[in-house]
Amino acid sequence: MAGQSLRRSAWVPLLLRLLLAGIAACEASPADDGAGPGGRGPRGRARGDAGADEAVPRHDSSYGTFAGEFYDLRYLSEEGYPFPTAPPVDPFAKIKVEDCGRTKGCFRYGKPGCNAETCDYFLSYRMIGADVEFELSADTDGWVAVGFSSDKKMGGDDVMACVHDDNGRVRIQHFYNVGQWAKEVQRNPARDEEGVFENNRVTCRFKRPVNVPRDETIVDLHLSWYYLFAWGPAIQGSITRHDIDSPPASERVVSIYKYEDIFMPSAAYQTFSSPFCLLLIVALTFYLLMGTP
């Protein structure tokens, strides 16, 4: 029994030392972690220092921050797999001249047999529901337009123009001819607009409603009008005078419900189409073949 008492008395000092060491460690840990008032943090700054708190960036663990940081990453993983990107914008669909006279009406001005990519000027129209879709194209780096007129003269006309600006865009604008001057009108009936500038040509496509509320600058397309065709240069996105002094126009009023494919030779191809010129050529040919008496 005496031996057991001696062994217990030997363990008591050791247990007391371990207990005191544990208490000391618990008292020191708040100061070391910077949790207590006036303590020092892991970066050696005073926890009570507001300026130091602002200097150290903090991480926001909210979902919005997580999503933003996730999508800011360039790759999904270290293997380098890129994030899927938005699909490219559909390219401008080419104008189908084979539909001219069948499912849409067309006007071609230029070389005989030309199409939407080679004519000096091209226009098509077709009904789509309560709208009329127009396609315009011209050999210019500025603008191409169509005017709806009660006569063949410029003045008091509703005009839709596709304008190529300095940023490379093609915008659809609405004008009203005041005499020989085209005034831009803020109310624009065009929608579903698209345009492109390629191969030194301005080409566009847009829709506008057949019937519109009464407005002197916007005509009702269910009525028949003369169509005025024009194109020319632009300066900083603003149209200037058309390329030719006497722009072509439709020979008669146009109905959007009647699809025709009409060709108009440009000035360079009109010389030999004149009846007088043809008669002169026949006379000269006969003279050369028969010889002088």
From Swiss-Prot:
<protein>
    <recommendedName>
        <fullName>DOMON domain-containing protein FRRS1L</fullName>
    </recommendedName>
</protein>
<comment type="subunit">
    <text>Component of the outer core of AMPAR complex. AMPAR complex consists of an inner core made of 4 pore-forming GluA/GRIA proteins (GRIA1, GRIA2, GRIA3 and GRIA4) and 4 major auxiliary subunits arranged in a twofold symmetry. One of the two pairs of distinct binding sites is occupied either by CNIH2, CNIH3 or CACNG2, CACNG3. The other harbors CACNG2, CACNG3, CACNG4, CACNG8 or GSG1L. This inner core of AMPAR complex is complemented by outer core constituents binding directly to the GluA/GRIA proteins at sites distinct from the interaction sites of the inner core constituents.</text>
</comment>
<dbReference type="GO" id="GO:1900449">
    <property type="term" value="P:regulation of glutamate receptor signaling pathway"/>
</dbReference>
<feature type="transmembrane region" description="Helical">
    <location>
        <begin position="271"/>
        <end position="291"/>
    </location>
</feature>
<dbReference type="InterPro" id="IPR042789">
    <property type="entry name" value="FRRS1L"/>
</dbReference>
<dbReference type="GO" id="GO:0005789">
    <property type="term" value="C:endoplasmic reticulum membrane"/>
</dbReference>
<keyword id="KW-0732">Signal</keyword>
<dbReference type="GO" id="GO:0051966">
    <property type="term" value="P:regulation of synaptic transmission, glutamatergic"/>
</dbReference>
<keyword id="KW-0472">Membrane</keyword>
<feature type="domain" description="DOMON">
    <location>
        <begin position="119"/>
        <end position="234"/>
    </location>
</feature>
<dbReference type="GO" id="GO:0005886">
    <property type="term" value="C:plasma membrane"/>
</dbReference>
<dbReference type="GO" id="GO:0098794">
    <property type="term" value="C:postsynapse"/>
</dbReference>
<feature type="signal peptide">
    <location>
        <begin position="1"/>
        <end position="28"/>
    </location>
</feature>
<dbReference type="Pfam" id="PF03351">
    <property type="entry name" value="DOMON"/>
</dbReference>
<keyword id="KW-0812">Transmembrane</keyword>
<dbReference type="GO" id="GO:1904717">
    <property type="term" value="P:regulation of AMPA glutamate receptor clustering"/>
</dbReference>
<keyword id="KW-1133">Transmembrane helix</keyword>
<dbReference type="GO" id="GO:0044877">
    <property type="term" value="F:protein-containing complex binding"/>
</dbReference>
<dbReference type="GO" id="GO:0099072">
    <property type="term" value="P:regulation of postsynaptic membrane neurotransmitter receptor levels"/>
</dbReference>
<dbReference type="GO" id="GO:0045505">
    <property type="term" value="F:dynein intermediate chain binding"/>
</dbReference>
<keyword id="KW-0770">Synapse</keyword>
<dbReference type="InterPro" id="IPR005018">
    <property type="entry name" value="DOMON_domain"/>
</dbReference>
<keyword id="KW-1003">Cell membrane</keyword>
<comment type="function">
    <text>Important modulator of glutamate signaling pathway.</text>
</comment>
<feature type="compositionally biased region" description="Basic and acidic residues">
    <location>
        <begin position="46"/>
        <end position="61"/>
    </location>
</feature>
<feature type="region of interest" description="Disordered">
    <location>
        <begin position="30"/>
        <end position="61"/>
    </location>
</feature>
